[in-house]
Structure formats: structure tokens, C-alpha cells
Amino acid sequence: MKNLFGYEIIQTLGQGKTGTAYLVEKNNSQFVLKKMNEQTEDPQKTLEIFNGEKYCYERMSRIGSGIPKLFEFDEKNHFLVKEYIQGETAATLATRGAFCKDGLTENHFRQILDMSGRFKKVGIHVDYFPTNFIYTNSGELYCIDYECYDYNSEWDFEHWGIYYWLNKDGMRAHLEKGGTSKLNKPGTFKPFDKPFEELKKRVMELV
């Protein structure tokens, strides 16, 4: 296995807009190592983005639970190591449908509503796209992406994220082929909403 900063790489978990995440192992324990994308034309920008992840981790951790622990933060080499959360993403569950046994259940929705409420209480919202959330085998919910913003209702779970969680066919297309053409209204970062309003009402009644 390839070694990266003293960790053995098991597999690549994914590549995002700010970096690449790897499942790694050290001393018989597994972690997630995220190596930041290097902004070669603007090294200062790389550092700002990297430090932003730590800042978001600190803000998000104020809700008390549901955030992977940060174990290592290397400013020189621009990588961080955090707790590895095993389970299924909300995106995978969403492809099986809402309010069904093998998809997103009532309990799953209660948990994300509770978490989004806790984020709101500390004055932030996160990226509620369902790939950023994992339900563990023991039933716990984690937000695995260190990304947050000052609270804005336009981008919270109720007014933005929920529509991605309810768009079964769109999420399946996204996971299989990439792209957001079946998730977002053309030319926007806003999700299709009208087809899912009745389901949304059912979810929000759980609050």
C-alpha cells in the first residue's frame, strides 16, 4: 500500500472542490486523510481554504455530537486527519426512497431535523447535500464535511437541502453518472422543489 504522511492508503474515498479524501490506516486504526488541492498560482489561497476547514470544524463541534473528531492538522503539508465514520450516506439511502424500510426512514428524518436545528441554534448552516451525511450501523448521524456558513435560511435544510434528500431519481442519476441536471433547476444551484412539496410537508410534521 502507498504511504502518505506516515499513513497507509487503503483507498481513495473521493475528490472534491477543495481536496482529495483517502481512507488510511496507522497503528491498526483507520482514519480519513484529506489532502488539500494546491492552488499553485496562489499558495496563500490554499492556506486560507485549509485553515477554513479547521475553523468550520470548531464551529460545527459546538452542537455537541455528530461531527467526526479532528486528530491531526498539518499546516505545512496542507493535510488533515479525522475520524473515519462507517455507514451509509444519506445520498445512498435517498436513492431507495423516502419513508421506506430500506431507504430514508422517519427516524432518519427526525435525526437530520434535530441536527439542522442544533446548527441553527449556534448560528450556522452546513452544506446539506446528502453525500455529506452518514448514518452509522448503530443508527447515529454524522455530518462528515467540515464546511459551514453564517446561518442563512435560504440555504438551510428546510428550504434547500431537503429537496435533494427527497429526489430519489435525481440522486440516483447523480451517484451513477455525476452532474446535477436532474437535481438542480437549469442554470442555478437551487433544487427542483415543486414535485416534492407533499413529501416535504410529511417530513416537516416530524419536527
Where are these regions (language model features)?
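Protein kinase catalytic-loop region centered on the HRD/HxD motif
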Residues: D114-I124
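C-lobe/activation-segment region of protein kinase-like
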Residues: I124, T136-V207
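Conserved structural core of kinase catalytic domains
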Residues: S65-H108
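Conserved N-terminal boundary motif of the eukaryotic protein kinase catalytic domain
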Residues: N3-T12
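ATP-binding glycine-rich loop module of kinase domains
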Residues: Q11-T12, K17-N51
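Conserved hydrophobic "DFG−1" position in protein kinase catalytic cores
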Residues: L23, K35, E72, V81-Y84, ...
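Hydrophobic residue at the +6 position relative to the catalytic HRD Asp in the kinase catalytic loop
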Residues: Y128-I134
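Structural motif at the C-terminus of the N-lobe alphaC helix and the adjacent alphaC-beta4 loop
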Residues: Y55-G66
